[in-house]
């Protein structure tokens, strides 16, 4: 056999060995660790037998370390003995998780007048009904007055936390900025789509900033900039997710997030430690203290009876959660019932989808779901920020509420309810549909809100069981808490914004429970609706719900929590306790105090040792080494906070580095070595062939038969 033929099998065997030996996470677990400010994290890691990896970009005193797999017991013991001395406050295992894109499958005189008026020559503009709907006048974003006034999103950057942006697309080249962009999946600067289904981010970006040229259609805010933060092309850890949501948060103004946990009617998932703190960090320190604007798609699980209050990203008070309405003002099949969504924007349904950009310089007519609705809201926010850059993240949410347009819907279960503040609210559409002209008009003269305040009720212990009790079947329970005038005054409360409710209800079929919150005015928010596919047997363990339905409603009076077993007593569980929190605008902005965000996020019985995160169907490991009780024995009297302060976590005020300082992944190492070995193999083969040919040419010709004779 020719020696060169042996190289292939030998190389394959060697590479297989190389891959198995190079994977750093093959034998190690990655952990997030928080240390005391004065502690050297490398020394602290060594003190517990771990290897230091790198700092977390966005959070001070938070670092990543590696521990050998299977060493949890010994590590815990070591931490208990030496962790506090080493200055370690908290340890949490990092588990890569998938985040799911929230996509959905599926010329006349007026139109010509509109396009000619604005000089739009894009060939597919006639298909962008969400911009100008000539078939159903008024069923669009109402952009004429905004564009006539010359507002196109200048000096605003929308960052798409997604699967990348094709910034070479002729519709996006001018809008793209590398300043706030990064590929967190491949750890490189350019977030170009690489996989066959990396289309989502490019489509979302085109909705906002597609150029007015002769390609595809146009964007809502064509002079805005777009940045790409690529995270959706592989499972990612909580730490990396948090870095993406804080990346470039002085240059990126809006973070458009059309993704979340699975919309299957079964999942219940929330941000873990680092991402929770990144959201807090963003609203406190982003945009020079005005707050990053986080826009989240509400979810596409309507046909599974899902509810966005089972998603800790969309039910966060820091998120502007956007639902969808179709071209005929019907409820799309994928639309979720949810008390946490502020407003709806146009998207797919009734045989029409959103026309936008697609990778490789192409266009698509099939973008949809709440994935398409959220970028439209981001675009409208960009239009407003271009003329009012002083608006805070809470101002944007207020203007969203006050400018929303309720509408008549052919859908029978739209169910608009008038609130005491004079708004109309639907659990399908929020406060109505987004109207760009109304939003910008309200924003122009908006008086910025005072700093945030809060009132936290004591934990209400109920401790009553569902099911058969003393020959009686218990299926309904009600618990009450009275907010007094004195509490309102001591809490420095002026206007109600968000209401959150934390519950602890172990139940052996979570999907059978319905949870409602009734305000003193009798307005009911559906916090948890029945989910027939949710067979989880743990119930709600310290899960926090949120509602915006009570915005600007008088908070004084009796608040009721109603918990119903919709199975009619077929299942068992216990309503253990609940806690009400009211968030709003302060009366006296000079009377400030640090906000209790992080205290509220920590479980009330966190103790030294491994703790399983309750706010998720996934299990993560946490170790808190400075035992802190966060249970409340009386209502919390608060004042307000400046947008840059908190007493519970150290928050960086500096801009994250333009490029993350990350270690090369084992895939990159293997790829480099593979390339090097293949190059060497080809080089040797060529040299071998050349030498063989050379010696063959130099060798004397073989003797003929006559010469042999």
Curated annotation (Swiss-Prot):
Q: Does the keyword S-adenosyl-L-methionine apply?
A: no
Transmembrane domains' residue ranges: 669-693
* UniProt-annotated location(s): Golgi apparatus, trans-Golgi network membrane
Post-translationally, this protein is described as follows, namely: N-glycosylated.
Q: Which residues form the propeptide?
A: 23-82, 83-102
Does the keyword Repressor belong to this entry? no
Its source organism is Schizosaccharomyces pombe (strain 972 / ATCC 24843) (Fission yeast)
Topology in the lipid bilayer is annotated as: Single-pass type I membrane protein
Span of the signal peptide:
1-22
- Per the Swiss-Prot or TrEMBL record, the active site comprises 162, 200, 371
Q: Which UniProt keywords apply?
A: Calcium, Cleavage on pair of basic residues, Disulfide bond, Glycoprotein, Golgi apparatus, Hydrolase, Membrane, Protease, Serine protease, Signal, Transmembrane, Transmembrane helix, Zymogen
Q: Which InterPro entries match?
A: Galactose-bd-like_sf, Kexin/furin, P_dom, Peptidase_S8/S53_dom, Peptidase_S8/S53_dom_sf, Peptidase_S8_Asp-AS, Peptidase_S8_His-AS, Peptidase_S8_Ser-AS
Give EC number(s), comma-separated. 3.4.21.-
Cytoplasmic compartment ranges equal: 694-709
Q: Which PANTHER family match?
A: NEUROENDOCRINE CONVERTASE 1 (PTHR42884:SF14), PROPROTEIN CONVERTASE SUBTILISIN/KEXIN-RELATED (PTHR42884)
Q: Where is the P/Homo B domain?
A: 449-588
Q: Report the protein name in the record.
A: Dibasic-processing endoprotease
Q: Which GO terms describe its cellular component?
A: cell surface; Golgi apparatus; Golgi membrane; membrane; trans-Golgi network
Q: List the disulfide bonds.
A: 216-363, 308-338
Q: Which residues are glycosylated?
A: 155, 463, 471, 620
Taken from the record's topology, the Lumenal segments are: 103-668
Q: Which GO terms describe its biological process?
A: peptide mating pheromone maturation involved in positive regulation of conjugation with cellular fusion; protein processing
Record domain Peptidase S8: where: 128-440
